[in-house]
A protein has these predicted regions:
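N-terminal catalytic cores of NTP/NDP-binding nucleotidyl/phosphoryl-transfer enzymes
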Residues: 1-47
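Non-catalytic positions within long, well-ordered alpha-helices that form the structural scaffold/packing
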Residues: 18, 52, 83-84
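Short, high-confidence coil segments that cap the C-terminus of an alpha-helix
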Residues: 20-22, 56, 87-88
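Structural preference for beta-strand elements that scaffold enzyme active sites
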Residues: 24-26, 59, 90
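Generic alpha-helix structural propensity
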Residues: 42-46, 54, 69, 73, ...
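Acidic, Ser/Thr-rich peripheral helices and adjacent loops at domain boundaries
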Residues: 46-49, 114-115
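A glycine-rich helix N-cap at a beta->alpha junction
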Residues: 48-64
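Active-site cores that bind ATP or allylic diphosphates and position pyrophosphate for catalysis
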Residues: 61-199
Length: 199
């Protein structure tokens, strides 16, 4: 998580994780700098206090090299810390689709042998990296499922799943549907503003 800043959607995610049966909730959170390479709006201590007040039991800082990295590296750092705890059974994350099983299909497609060749072919055709990833994943999981990559929280969820597979973490996954405004929306939706709007 980044919690930049902590908002009602983050509180809803923690509550949904608890409602799904979590007896304890450990969060891995970036420190004072975020994936965008910018300082977080609030210091990490304030964001930790908000997370604890809203139901998290433990907040672990994701070290800077992972916190400021692309989704694949960010996810690997977070998953490795949770795995090191030795007690995590379920990895819960927010996502636009709310369906961890569908995200697992995309993750498997991206780890299939045909993926890299299809990715190279799409990149050579001149499409953006994001579009090329989606095209390459569709070879194994179909266009509709691969389209889940078009959404940033889905993409991060997919990278958490891929990291868990690479690291041999035996986690189950809980995808909690994002509530309120979309990731990049600057308007409030259903009483919940995105981090983008708040920043």
């Amino acid at each position: 998580a980044e919690y930049d800043p902590f908002h009602a959607g983050h509180a809803a995610h923690i509550a949904a994780t608890r409602a799904a049966g979590a007896t304890h909730i450990a969060v891995v959170m970036s420190g004072n700098f975020t994936q965008r390479g910018k300082p977080a709006l609030l210091p990490k201590q304030r964001r930790v206090a908000m997370a604890l007040k809203c139901g998290a039991d433990l907040v672990i800082e994701l070290p800077l090299p992972w916190a400021m990295a692309p989704a694949e590296v960010f996810a690997t750092g977070g998953v490795s810390l949770l795995q090191a705890l030795g007690c995590v059974q379920v990895l819960s994350f927010g996502c636009e689709c709310g369906d961890a099983a569908s995200l697992q299909l995309v993750a498997s497609a991206m780890d299939a042998s045909a993926y890299n060749a299809a990715l190279r072919q799409a990149m050579q055709a001149g499409v953006s990296y994001a579009a090329a990833r989606q095209t390459a994943a569709s070879v194994s999981c179909g266009e509709e499922t691969a389209a889940l990559l078009a959404y940033p929280n889905n993409t991060l969820g997919i990278e958490y799943i891929r990291a868990a597979a690479r690291l041999g973490a035996g986690f189950d996954f809980l995808g909690v549907r994002r509530q309120g405004a979309g990731h990049h929306d600057e308007a409030i939706a259903d009483g919940i503003a995105s981090g983008t709007a708040l920043r």
